[in-house]
């Protein structure tokens, strides 16, 4: 049984900028 640990999966996906193109989420 392998358990995948999701660590910061939110920041990793929005890093390429492919999903949200017109929106820039840099300054929180």
Swiss-Prot record:
Transferase found in the keyword field: no
Tissues in which the protein is found: Testis.
GO cellular component, one term: nucleosome
GO molecular function: DNA binding
Compartments where found: Nucleus; Chromosome
Species per Swiss-Prot/TrEMBL record: Octopus vulgaris
Keywords noted in UniProt: Chromosome, Developmental protein, Differentiation, DNA condensation, DNA-binding, Nucleosome core, Nucleus, Spermatogenesis
Biological function: Protamines substitute for histones in the chromatin of sperm during the haploid phase of spermatogenesis. They compact sperm DNA into a highly condensed, stable and inactive complex.
Region entry Disordered, spans: 1-28
GO biological process, one term: spermatogenesis
Protein name: Sperm protamine P4
Domain of life of the source: Eukaryota
